């Protein structure tokens, strides 16, 4: 900050106020599970191959639409061992909502598919509206409720929580780490994806 002062912030009052508002029926509690029952089948039924690739990145890495709508070759950072699953993954560097930046880890198969595409094209770019429409039609064919591409982030959060738990992280640490991977700050945000 401009005054060179150390400041600490505690936003926990927000959750307390929200909980109390819900108890008093001032806020509708209409959160529902937006994860797809079979996200792989949903992706299989997508008509556009670029949409399939974008959806795989969202499902495997938890990226938002901003992270997959436009990807350039310089965003591909190679591979590394995922310390949680001990599986080698491809690294895509993304900038998403609020300017938050970071790594998105995807399977080597998905990473190589993206890398191959970018070796023949200047950029990976999808039209968001066409992507949403493709997902909507695929959900219909797959007998799923359409939750747009954000539903794939829900699937990511649930799977990643399980992976952290298998790696002997505490519940609170699982929440926090998944929150960071999804480019959130507060651990409590992850709870919304676990409904």
Which positions does each model-derived feature cover?
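Active-site/catalytic core of tyrosine-dependent DNA strand-transfer enzymes
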Residues: 105-162
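Conserved tyrosine-mediated DNA breakage-rejoining catalytic core shared by Y-recombinases
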Residues: 70-113
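A short, glycine-centered helix-capping/turn motif at helix boundaries
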Residues: 48, 57-71, 163-164, 182-184
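Non-catalytic DNA-binding core/recognition domains of DNA-processing enzymes
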Residues: 1-5, 106
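A short mid-domain helix/strand-loop element embedded in enzyme catalytic domains
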Residues: 14-40, 46-48
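Basic, Lys/Arg- and aromatic-enriched nucleic-acid-binding interface segment
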Residues: 34-65, 175
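Major-groove recognition helix of helix-turn-helix-like DNA-binding domains
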Residues: 188-195
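C-terminal catalytic core of tyrosine-transesterase DNA break-rejoin enzymes
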Residues: 153-188
């Amino acid at each position: 900050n401009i005054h060179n002062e150390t400041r600490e912030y505690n936003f926990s009052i927000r959750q307390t106020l929200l909980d109390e508002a819900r108890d008093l029926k001032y806020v509708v509690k209409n959160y529902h599970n937006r994860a797809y029952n079979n996200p792989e089948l949903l992706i299989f039924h997508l008509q556009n191959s670029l949409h399939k690739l974008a959806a795989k990145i969202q499902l495997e890495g938890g990226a938002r639409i901003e992270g997959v709508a436009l990807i350039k070759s310089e965003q591909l950072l190679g591979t590394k061992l995922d310390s949680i699953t001990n599986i080698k993954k491809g690294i895509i560097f993304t900038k998403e909502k609020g300017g938050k930046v970071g790594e998105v880890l995807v399977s080597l198969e998905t990473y190589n598919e993206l890398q191959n595409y970018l070796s023949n094209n200047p950029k990976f770019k999808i039209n968001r509206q066409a992507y949403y429409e493709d997902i909507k039609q695929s959900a219909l064919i797959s007998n799923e409720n359409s939750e747009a591409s954000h539903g794939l982030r829900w699937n990511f959060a649930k799977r990643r929580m399980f992976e952290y738990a298998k790696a002997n992280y505490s519940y609170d640490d699982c929440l926090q780490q998944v929150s960071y991977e999804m480019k959130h700050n507060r651990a409590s945000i992850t709870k919304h994806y676990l409904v």
